[in-house]
A protein has these predicted regions:
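Amphipathic alpha-helical packing segments from all-alpha helical-bundle domains
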Residues: 94, 100, 106, 113-140, ...
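Hydrophobic/aromatic-rich alpha-helical bundle segments in the mid-to-C-terminal region
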Residues: 117, 121, 135-186
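Short amphipathic alpha-helical interaction/hinge segments
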Residues: 57, 61-65, 96, 113, ...
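Hydrophobic alpha-helical connector segments
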Residues: 52, 66-99, 150-156
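Helix-turn-helix
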Residues: 6, 10, 14-56
Length: 194
């Protein structure tokens, strides 16, 4: 791991635990094992580190989870839909970088406009638009009954978002949260899929 990557890793851990304002550049440098002035060889300052973290997490999420622009292959069956959706949710809930990033975003969404936008996109708008496209594709293939794909996306994603937030607050409930999400997903499929 390069020094630049070590800085990001340390900063993410500290920002997630202490918040952006509760973390000083000296804390980050200390964890990395460098002097604070050496950190400025890699980043202009704490805000530059924060922006690099968000950019990195966005790229990771795009590749591993998808987005409105990158929905992946439209599932061809109920079981494929459940499998792919649970894999995405498992990644979101369990990936340490995404989890820490989410904790940072939740804390800082009221103090930083960019973070507010990213949080809304990942927890509401973007995920709903992504699943609306997937559901619409499955409607077009006759797998999902004809209905409003946007409303179905809300119905599908809202419980998952709430359970992920619960697992972040209460990690000991992660298994229970995943079971609930899968139960809800199977119910959704039973109601809306052929």
């Amino acid at each position: 791991m390069s020094t630049k990557e070590k800085i990001l890793d340390a900063a993410l851990t500290l920002f997630a635990a202490n918040g952006y304002d509760g973390t000083r550049v000296e804390h980050i440098a200390n964890i990395v094992g460098i002097k604070a002035p050496s950190l400025y060889k890699h980043y202009k300052g704490k805000e530059d580190i924060l922006n690099a973290l968000i950019d990195s997490a966005e790229e990771r999420y795009e590749v591993m989870f998808g987005s409105e622009k990158n929905i992946g292959k439209v599932p061809e069956s109920r079981e494929e839909f459940i499998k792919v959706t649970m894999e995405r949710i498992s990644f979101t809930m369990r990936d340490p970088i995404i989890r820490k990033t989410r904790m940072l975003l939740v804390q800082e969404q009221f103090r930083n406009e960019r973070i507010s936008e990213v949080t809304t996109r990942h927890q509401l708008d973007g995920i709903q638009r992504m699943f609306a496209k997937i559901i619409k594709g499955m409607m077009d293939e006759g797998i999902v009954v004809k209905d409003d794909p946007k409303l179905l996306a809300v119905e599908l994603t809202a419980p998952a978002v709430l359970q992920i937030a619960r697992a972040d607050r209460q990690p000991q409930c992660e298994k229970e949260c995943m079971e609930y999400i899968e139960k809800h997903l199977r119910h959704f499929c039973k109601v809306y899929m052929r």
